[in-house]
Amino acid sequence: MTEKLSTETRGPLLEPLFASGWEMVEGRDAIKKTFVFDNFVDAFGWMTRVAIWAEKWNHHPEWDNVYKTVNVVLTTHDVGGLSTLDAKLARKMDSLAG
């Protein structure tokens, strides 16, 4: 079972994500990032590719899409905060966004 990030694992997993634009969500043990694409088709295509990985890993983002902008929040509800799954999905999102 996935566990909430410990103090020891939090820094090494999250610092590279912060360097790529991810931020902590105020008042929650969650991270967020806004992705902006050239147009709606690119944004929705990216969301579709992410959804395939999210389903494969059974870990789903909180997200919304307006035209070419996608706002993402990641947390693991089962553990009440951030887990390795969030870091893994964030890295995948970054790589798929190019």
Curated annotation (Swiss-Prot):
UniProt cross-references to CDD domains, sorted A to Z:
PCD_DCoH_subfamily_b (cd00914)
Q: What is its EC number?
A: 4.2.1.96
Q: Which GO terms describe its biological process?
A: tetrahydrobiopterin biosynthetic process
Q: What protein name does the entry list? A: Putative pterin-4-alpha-carbinolamine dehydratase
Pfam families to which the protein is assigned, alphabetical: Pterin_4a (PF01329)
What family name appears in the similarity comment? Belongs to the pterin-4-alpha-carbinolamine dehydratase family.
InterPro entries noted in UniProt: PCD_sf, Pterin_deHydtase
The record lists the catalysed reaction(s) as: (4aS,6R)-4a-hydroxy-L-erythro-5,6,7,8-tetrahydrobiopterin = (6R)-L-erythro-6,7-dihydrobiopterin + H2O
Molecular function terms, GO-annotated: 4-alpha-hydroxytetrahydrobiopterin dehydratase activity
Record keywords: Lyase
Q: Which residues form a coiled coil?
A: none
Q: Which Gene3D superfamilies match?
A: Transcriptional coactivator/pterin dehydratase (3.30.1360.20)
